[in-house]
Amino acid sequence: MDKKTTESAKKALCELLTKCVDISNGTKAACFMDYEPHLNSYSVFLHRDGWSPTSEAEWIAMCKAITKENVMATLEKLEKICEELEGKENV
């Protein structure tokens, strides 16, 4: 497994993290992102009604290879979720 992440994938990963922060700061939803550099992987999950000890997370992505394409696909999923949330709150 190649553990090196390309510059374009790193940039996309930063965009993904920014979107997670924007969702968490702009809505009642809580968006989490885990980055595992030793595995070259990441995961994103969401609590639509905010985090609580008893709430279940909605898994958005569990990616085992950080590529620009994989990260952009996850970002597209989050964009669709943002559109759904915009009816309730402003992201």
Regions found by a protein language model. Name each.
Residues 47:
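Single-stranded nucleic acid-binding surfaces, predominantly the OB-fold ssDNA-binding core
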Residues 1-41, 50-91:
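Negatively charged, low-complexity tracts enriched in Asp/Glu with abundant Ser/Thr
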